[in-house]
Amino acid sequence: MVKFLKPNKAVILLQGRYAGKKAVIVKTFDDGTREKPYGHCLVAGIKKFPSKVIKKDSAKKTAKKSRVKAFVKLVNYQHLMPTRYTLDVDLKDAVVPDVLQSKDKKVTALKETKKSLEERFKTGKNRWFFTKLRF
């Protein structure tokens, strides 16, 4: 079978707290692990999408509206919907599988993810990824 869930692939989460949110695959575990004996992957996604910026907004307000909140999570393949989009953002060094073991590691990983996603948003690339799903 062809593996189409590869790193940097944009996905939509279908179940749980972040259902309907967009995420990007960081690392895949096709054969599972000892703790999770099923196919799953580590994803980093957008918890809170940036708001729409208009021309008359001040610089301060524009900066506030351009903020992104991120999340990092291990997700079962059954709870993902893959999309045709890929996101060329480098999260491999910031988000590693053992990040979820301790709180302080997770906080630093979230800050790194947030920074790289905000930078991607401000350059105007991958516009689809930063728009809220309307459903």
From Swiss-Prot:
Keyword hit for Glycoprotein: no
UniProt keyword terms in alphabetical order: Ribonucleoprotein, Ribosomal protein
Highest taxon of the lineage: Eukaryota
GO BP terms, alphabetized: translation
Entry GO MF terms: structural constituent of ribosome
Gene3D superfamilies hit by this protein: 2.30.30.770
GO CC terms in record: ribonucleoprotein complex; ribosome
Family matches, as Pfam families: Ribosomal_L27e
CDD domains: KOW_RPL27
Segment forming the signal sequence: none
Record InterPro entries: Ribosomal_eL27 (IPR001141), Ribosomal_eL27_CS (IPR018262), Ribosomal_eL27_KOW (IPR041991), Ribosomal_eL27_sf (IPR038655), Translation_prot_SH3-like_sf (IPR008991)
Assigned protein family: Belongs to the eukaryotic ribosomal protein eL27 family.
Protein name per its UniProtKB record: Large ribosomal subunit protein eL27
Organism from which the protein derives: Pisum sativum
Species lineage: Eukaryota, Viridiplantae, Streptophyta, Embryophyta, Tracheophyta
Gene field: RPL27
